[in-house]
Regions:
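Catalytic Walker B motif of ABC-type/P-loop ATPase nucleotide-binding domains
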Residues: 182-186
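Conserved ABC ATPase signature
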Residues: 157-164
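Conserved ABC transporter NBD signature motif
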Residues: 85-96, 100-101
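Q-loop/switch helix immediately C-terminal to the Walker
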Residues: 111, 116-132
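Helix-to-loop junction immediately C-terminal to a conserved catalytic motif
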Residues: 77
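Hydrophobic anchor residue at the start of the ABC signature
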Residues: 171, 210
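Conserved ABC ATPase "signature" region
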Residues: 125, 138-153
Length: 268
C-alpha cells in the first residue's frame, strides 16, 4: 500500500444525513450524553452538548479546529472528566463503573501510541492483552494484521514503519479485541485510498453487527447513514448567537429559524 495521503483528501465527506437534522430520539439510546460541558485551560470549549447513539449508529464530529472534537472523544472514552453534564450507558452513569466502560469501547487517538522497540505483532499483542487481561490467540492477531495489510511486517520493529503503516497498526487494535463502541480521532491521517477503504469496510461490518462508532475527521470517510454533530453550535455564547437570533427576528419568520431553535434541532 502507498501510505501517502492524496492531496485531494483535504476535507470531510458529508455524511448522508449531514443536510438534515436528526429527529428527536424518544426511545432511549445505548450511549448518551446530556448537557456535557468541556473546560480546557480554564476556557469553556462547549456546553449543553447532547448526543444519543443506538446499536449500529455512527456519529461524525464536525467543527473547526479548537471546537472540542478531540476533547469530546476523550470525554466519551472516560479519559477526560467533563466540566458538567452526564455520560450514560443504558441510562447508568459511566463514572459508576469506569472499568466496564473501558472494556466496552476502543479509543484510537490522533497519536499512534506504539512501542517502537517492539515488533508489529508484539505491539498488537501487548495492547490486545491489556484489554483482554490475557494473552490473545495468535490467530486473532494475524487476522487483524492481515486485514490492514501488515501481516508481512509482523516481525518488523515498529520504529521502521512508515507513518501510514503505524496508523494502520493502531487501527488494527479495534479488530483484535471486540468492543461495542469505537471512538476514532482522525483515523484516516496518513492513509492512502486503499487503506481508507479498508477502514470504511471495517466500520461498516462493525455497525452491521450492532456496534457504534464516533469519528472526528478532516478526511473523506464514507459512512452510510451517519449523524453529524456540529460542535461549534455548542460553543459558549460570545455574542454571535445573539446577533444571529436578532437578525432572524428582524427578518421575521420567512422560513428562517432562530439560532437557538436551529441548535436545539441539531442535537442528535
Amino acid at each position: 500500500m502507498n501510505d501517502t495521503k492524496s492531496p485531494s483528501r483535504n476535507a470531510p465527506k458529508a455524511p448522508e444525513a449531514a443536510g438534515a437534522d436528526r429527529p428527536q430520539d424518544n426511545g432511549g439510546g445505548l450511549f448518551t450524553g446530556r448537557g456535557l460541558v468541556c473546560v480546557r485551560g480554564g476556557r469553556t470549549v462547549f456546553e449543553g452538548l447532547d448526543f444519543t447513539l443506538k446499536s449500529g449508529d455512527a456519529l461524525v464530529l464536525l467543527g473547526p479546529n479548537g471546537s472540542g472534537k478531540s476533547s469530546l472523544l476523550r470525554i466519551m472514552a472516560g479519559l477526560l472528566k467533563p466540566g458538567g453534564g452526564d455520560l450514560l450507558w443504558y441510562g447508568y452513569a459511566v463514572t459508576d463503573d469506569p472499568e466496564s466502560h473501558h472494556a466496552r469501547q476502543h479509543y484510537v487517538g490522533h497519536l499512534d501510541g506504539l512501542k517502537v522497540a517492539m515488533t508489529v505483532s508484539e505491539n498488537l499483542s501487548f495492547w490486545t492483552g491489556l484489554r483482554m487481561g490475557e494473552a490473545p490467540p495468535p490467530g486473532l492477531i494475524r487476522n487483524a494484521l492481515d486485514t490492514f495489510g501488515l501481516d508481512h511486517l509482523a516481525d518488523f520493529p515498529a520504529r521502521m514503519l512508515s507513518a501510514g503503516q503505524k496508523r494502520r497498526l493502531s487501527l488494527a487494535r479495534v479488530l483484535a479485541s471486540p468492543a461495542d463502541l469505537w471512538l476514532l480521532d482522525e483515523p484516516a491521517v496518513a492513509l492512502d485510498r486503499e487503506s481508507v477503504a479498508t477502514l470504511e469496510q471495517a466500520i461498516a461490518r462493525h455497525r452491521r453487527r450492532g456496534g457504534m462508532v464516533v469519528v472526528a475527521t478532516h478526511s473523506e470517510i464514507a459512512l452510510s447513514r451517519a449523524w453529524p454533530l456540529y460542535l461549534d453550535r455548542f460553543a459558549p455564547s460570545s455574542g454571535l448567537a445573539e446577533l444571529r437570533e436578532d437578525a432572524a427576528t428582524a427578518l421575521g419568520d420567512g422560513g428562517h429559524k432562530s439560532a437557538r431553535a436551529s441548535r436545539q434541532e441539531a442535537q442528535p
